Regions:
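Non-catalytic, conserved peripheral segments adjacent to functional cores
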Residues: 1-106, 125-127, 134-139
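Conserved metal-binding segment of the jelly-roll/cupin
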Residues: 103-125
Length: 139
């Protein structure tokens, strides 16, 4: 897995290694040990969510405040989206700035969106399936 800090260093792009041949492919989509080693702290993802959307749908921007704040690890299972994270931490030097990343079923990129960020995406293909790991329960 490759981890890349974005212009907002707390937002991380994760690119898993894809092992493929004529039969298809295999990919580890999540490795807690590798992510925690990169971050320097432990995350406890306790819930997985999935949504299916049509082209043109805009989901977000959503955010949760304490005690319901969430770190999200998001990826596309089929289709593609333009995914956006906006820093809404008032005392942050990057307050109000955003990161936008195209996530697709083909590129397998994932985005780690920490607590204190608004998150959303616009769907770029019909029948896009989007998956979220979160470290706090939906409320």
């Amino acid at each position: 897995m490759q981890f890349t800090r974005t212009k907002i260093e707390d937002v991380i792009i994760i690119e898993p290694k894809v092992h493929g041949d004529h039969r298809g492919y295999f990919v580890e989509t999540f490795r807690a040990d590798k992510l925690e080693e990169f971050l320097g702290y432990k995350l406890n993802f306790g819930q997985d969510n999935e949504s299916k959307s049509s082209k043109g749908v805009l989901r977000g921007l959503h955010y949760q405040l304490a005690p319901h704040a969430q770190t999200k690890l998001v990826r596309v299972i089929s289709g593609r989206v333009l995914d956006v994270a906006v820093d809404i931490r008032r005392n942050s030097p990057t307050f109000g700035q955003h990161v936008a990343v195209e996530l697709t079923a083909d590129n397998k990129k994932q985005l780690l969106v920490p607590r204190g960020f608004a998150h959303g995406f616009v769907v770029l293909e019909d029948d896009t399936i989007f998956a979220y790991k979160v470290d706090n329960y939906y409320s």
